[in-house]
Amino acid sequence: MLLLKQISPPFHLHQLRRRISTIISAGFTLNLPKLEPSSDAELISQMLITNHNPFHFMESSLQLNGISLTPNLIHQTLLRLRHNSKIALSFFQYLRSLPSPSTTPTSFNLIIDILGRVRQFDVVRQLIVEMDQTSPETFLILVKRLIAAGLTRQAVRAFDDAPCFLENRRFRLVEFGFLLDTLCKYGYTKMAVGVFNERKEEFGSDEKVYTILIAGWCKLRRIDMAEKFLVEMIESGIEPNVVTYNVLLNGICRTASLHPEERFERNVRNAEKVFDEMRQRGIEPDVTSFSIVLHMYSRAHKAELTLDKMKLMKAKGISPTIETYTSVVKCLCSCGRLEEAEELLETMVESGISPSSATYNCFFKEYKGRKDANGAMNLYRKMKNGLCKPSTQTYNVLLGTFINLGKMETVKEIWDDLKASETGPDLDSYTSLVHGLCSKEKWKEACGYFVEMIERGFLPQKLTFETLYKGLIQSNKMRTWRRLKKKLDEESITFGSEFQRYPFEPYKR
DNA sequence: CTAGGGTTAG
C-alpha cells in the first residue's frame, strides 16, 4: 500500500506492475499472512484514491495481485471510499461496465447513501431508474439522506413513490415508523406529526410509533407536547412500555437546566414523578432509566448523589452497564476527582465490563480543561499501545486540547493518526481543525481543509464559512477566496439562513 | 434504517 502511494499521477502500467510485484515478493520474503478481503479493499481503494481512478489498469493489477472482485470485496472497497463520493461513483460505474457486471443490491444501496451524503440526488434518481436493483432499503436510505439535506417534502414523496419501483410491495408500519423517526431525529417533529395524522388510518399505530413522536418532541424540548402525546397514546388504547417512559424521562433530564439549585431539585422531582408513574402502571424502571437520572446528576456535578444512586440501583439488583459507569466516571472526572475515577475503572473491569473510548474520553476532557498536555499524551499513548482503540471523538478532544495550547505540530500528528484511523475525521474534527487554523491565521491551509471536508460530504457550519471568509478577505487572499467560491458553486452550496438548521447529523450509536 | 441511556461541540 505504501509502495503504491509513492507512484504519482502520470504513471505507467509497467511502473505499477513493478511495484505490485515488489509487494508480492516482499510478502513472500517477510512471510506475510494471506491478504484478507478487508486489506485487499484497503489496497484497492488506496490505489483508486492515490492514482486518480486508474480503471484501465485495474483489471490487470488485480490479476497480478491474485485478487478477484467478490461482492464482499466490492462492498468493503466502497465502504473505504465512502468519503470520496466521486471516486466511489467512478468505481461503481466501472463495476457496471465490466463484461459481467458485479454490482449487488448491497453495494447499490451503499453508493446511494454515499451520493446522498453529498446531495447528488439527481445521480441517485438516475441510478434508481437505470438499474434494477432497488430494494425497500434503497428508498429508506434515500428518504434519510433527503431529510438530512432538509428536503423533507421530497423525502415524503420518495416514500410514497417507492411502491411503484418495488413491484407494488407496500410499505408497512415499520417503514412508516422509520420515516417518522428520521424526520424527528433531524428535528422535523412537527412535520412528522402532520404525516402521522394524515396516514395513521392507512398504516395504523403502535407503541413504537408513539414513542418515536414523543422522542421527537423531547428533542425539541417540548416536554408539554411529549406529555400530550403520551396521554393521546393511552387514550387510543396503546399501553406505553419502559422505552416510552425512558424517552420521556430522558427528555426531562437531558435538557433540564441545572443552574440554580431550586431548578435542579425541581427536575429531580419531575424525574421521580416519572418513576412513580411507571411503577403505578406496573412497569419497573430498568438500567436505562437509572442511567438517565445518573447522567443528570453527573451533569450537575453532584458526585455524592451520583455515587449514592448507583449504590441504590445495585441494591435493587440492577447491574450497571458501560453507559452507567461512563456517566459516573464523567462525573468524577469533571469534579476533578481523577483518582476515584480511576478506582471506578478498576471496579468496572472487575465486574467484567471493559471501559470504552467513551469512558476514557471523560479523562481527556478533564485534561483539556486543565490544559494538561502530558496527562493527555500519556493516556493517548496507552490507548495506542492497545488499551482501547481511540474513537473519532477521542481525536476530536485531543485536537481541541492542542489547538488551545497552540501546539500545532502535535495537532498535525494527531490529525495524521485520525486520518489513518478506521473511522476517519468527522464534521467536528474538520470544524475544530479549520477553526484552529483560522485562529492561527493560516488561511490557505484552513481553506484546503474546508474544501476537503466538503468533498468528503461534510456540510460546514455557517460560522466556519464566515470565519474563513472574513480571514481571506482581510488578509487579501483573493485568489484563494475565488478558488473556494468556485468550489462552492460547483457543489451548489450556499450559506444562507437555512444552513443553521441542520449543522449536525444526529448521533448514532 | 429498525422506538431508549454513556463520549463530542465554535
Curated annotation (Swiss-Prot):
It comes from the Eukaryota. InterPro entries: Pentatricopeptide_rpt (IPR002885), TPR-like_helical_dom_sf (IPR011990). The keyword Mitochondrion applies. Keywords: Mitochondrion, Repeat, Transit peptide. Its main location: mitochondrion. It is found in: Mitochondrion. Transmembrane segments: none annotated. Residues 1-19 form a transit peptide. The keyword Transcription regulation does not apply. One of its GO terms (cellular component) is mitochondrion. Pfam families: PPR, PPR_2. PPR repeats lie at residues 172-202, 206-240, 241-285, 286-320, 321-355, 356-390, 391-425, 426-460. NCBIfam families: PPR. PANTHER family: PENTATRICOPEPTIDE REPEAT-CONTAINING PROTEIN (PTHR47936:SF8), PPR_LONG DOMAIN-CONTAINING PROTEIN (PTHR47936). Belongs to the PPR family. P subfamily. This is Pentatricopeptide repeat-containing protein At2g13420, mitochondrial. It comes from Arabidopsis thaliana. The lineage of its organism: Eukaryota, Viridiplantae, Streptophyta, Embryophyta, Tracheophyta.
